[in-house]
Structures are given as C-alpha cells and as structure tokens.
Amino acid sequence: MSIFIQLNNISVNFNNRSILSNISLALTPNCILTLIGPNGAGKSTLVRVILGLLKPNQGKIFFKNNLRIGYIPQKLNLHSTLPITVNRFMNLSYFNDKNYIQGMLSRINIIHLKHHPLQKLSGGEMQKVLLARALLKKPELLVLDEPTQGIDIIGKIAFYKLVNQIKNELKCSILMVSHDLSIVMANTDKVICLNNHICCSGPPETISKNSEFIAIFGNIGKNYLALYRHRHNHHHDF
C-alpha cells in the first residue's frame, strides 16, 4: 500500500512539557482519518507536524515526494482595516488561472460571493471559501483543523456533505480534526483518539468500545460513534 505520510514515534516537547508522546500513524490514499481528543490533547500540534510546520523533538517522518496538501485552518484572522473580497483572496494564491478559480467558486456554490468582503461572510460561507482555496492545487491530502467551529448544525451537515463529495471526486485523502463526534464520524474510515499519546485507533465501531475513549468522552461519545456510522446503503437529503 502506498503511503502519503508516515510518522514513527514522534514526540514534541515545549518548555520541558510533553505535548505529543511516541505518535506513530500513516496517512494513505483515498481514506478519511478523523483525529479526536479533548482540549490540550495535542491535536493542533500534530497537525503542524504533519504539515511540516513543526519539527518534532524525536522520531522520523516520511513524506511522499511532491505530495500536494490542501489545508483549512480553524479560523482565519482578518484585520477589519484591510478589507479584501473573496475574489481577491482566491487570486492571492500561486494559481493564476482565473477561469479555474472561478470554476472552483462555482463548484463550491459560492460564485455569488466573489465580490463580497471576507469580513462580511458567515462562518459557513467563510469555510467554503477556505475549502475552495485549499482545492486549487488539486490536493492529494486535505487537512481540516476543526473546520466547522462556530457553525450551526445545519451548516455543519452541509459542509461535511460537500467535503465528502469533493473527496469522492478528487479521490483524495482527508485528515479531519474535530470535536463533532455526532457528524464527522459519518464517513470516517479510521478514528484516532489522541490525549498526548494515541489512546486508541480503528474504525468507529471499535473505538466506541475502547475503555480509554469512554474515559475521555463518556457514554455520549460512545453513543455518537455507534449511531452515526454510515453504511453506504442509503442517502441523505439536505
């Protein structure tokens, strides 16, 4: 099996404090890997390591040559005194094919927003803009760090449905970081529960029975994982 990114015994320390301890995982083609864990578990730190933004104190990392990665951050901080439209934001990328950019805005159903200032967008609209920009390089791996934070339940469902459609179209892999157990798990192939170390990993139905997972998330998390596993034998209308 080909591998996009392989982490072997990765550890990260800040100020003599262990943030990540002996993390080993592999990101493979055409799969959805969901990373969950409590606040302070090291999820965002692990994402920075995977993106190559942070060098670990220990361990080895393997990246596929010329791996194309798209990234959607938790939040994009914009200064109110520097207004910028969606169209200008999209064109700030290295990608200079204007027709392709407009086509991507249409694909994500936000072409009507292209002249809107980013500061005026709703949370759901902003995440769609970030998704469109992340897709410009036709990523093999799409990394989403708490992508629906602050979005209402209907917006979350619509966003995850769109992401799953994109995944199927591009045949890309997705690394999802989230607390939204009730929704994110719907199409997840593998779950990793992180709390400084990897507590447990596997398909949702296996994780839901793990004692360390239950200790962190309780029976609410257990019920979410059991209830929302997608069996691919029905469809949803939104």
From Swiss-Prot:
<keyword id="KW-1003">Cell membrane</keyword>
<comment type="function">
    <text>Part of the ABC transporter complex ZnuABC involved in zinc import. Responsible for energy coupling to the transport system.</text>
</comment>
<keyword id="KW-0864">Zinc transport</keyword>
<dbReference type="GO" id="GO:0005524">
    <property type="term" value="F:ATP binding"/>
</dbReference>
<feature type="binding site">
    <location>
        <begin position="37"/>
        <end position="44"/>
    </location>
    <ligand>
        <name>ATP</name>
    </ligand>
</feature>
<dbReference type="GO" id="GO:0005886">
    <property type="term" value="C:plasma membrane"/>
</dbReference>
<keyword id="KW-0406">Ion transport</keyword>
<dbReference type="InterPro" id="IPR017871">
    <property type="entry name" value="ABC_transporter-like_CS"/>
</dbReference>
<feature type="domain" description="ABC transporter">
    <location>
        <begin position="5"/>
        <end position="220"/>
    </location>
</feature>
<comment type="subunit">
    <text>The complex is composed of two ATP-binding proteins (ZnuC), two transmembrane proteins (ZnuB) and a solute-binding protein (ZnuA).</text>
</comment>
<keyword id="KW-0547">Nucleotide-binding</keyword>
<dbReference type="InterPro" id="IPR003593">
    <property type="entry name" value="AAA+_ATPase"/>
</dbReference>
<dbReference type="GO" id="GO:0016887">
    <property type="term" value="F:ATP hydrolysis activity"/>
</dbReference>
<dbReference type="Pfam" id="PF00005">
    <property type="entry name" value="ABC_tran"/>
</dbReference>
<dbReference type="InterPro" id="IPR027417">
    <property type="entry name" value="P-loop_NTPase"/>
</dbReference>
<comment type="similarity">
    <text>Belongs to the ABC transporter superfamily. Zinc importer (TC 3.A.1.15.5) family.</text>
</comment>
<dbReference type="GO" id="GO:0010043">
    <property type="term" value="P:response to zinc ion"/>
</dbReference>
<dbReference type="GO" id="GO:0015633">
    <property type="term" value="F:ABC-type zinc transporter activity"/>
</dbReference>
<dbReference type="InterPro" id="IPR050153">
    <property type="entry name" value="Metal_Ion_Import_ABC"/>
</dbReference>
<dbReference type="InterPro" id="IPR003439">
    <property type="entry name" value="ABC_transporter-like_ATP-bd"/>
</dbReference>
<protein>
    <recommendedName>
        <fullName>Zinc import ATP-binding protein ZnuC</fullName>
        <ecNumber>7.2.2.20</ecNumber>
    </recommendedName>
</protein>
<keyword id="KW-1278">Translocase</keyword>
<keyword id="KW-0862">Zinc</keyword>
<keyword id="KW-0813">Transport</keyword>
<keyword id="KW-0067">ATP-binding</keyword>
<keyword id="KW-0472">Membrane</keyword>
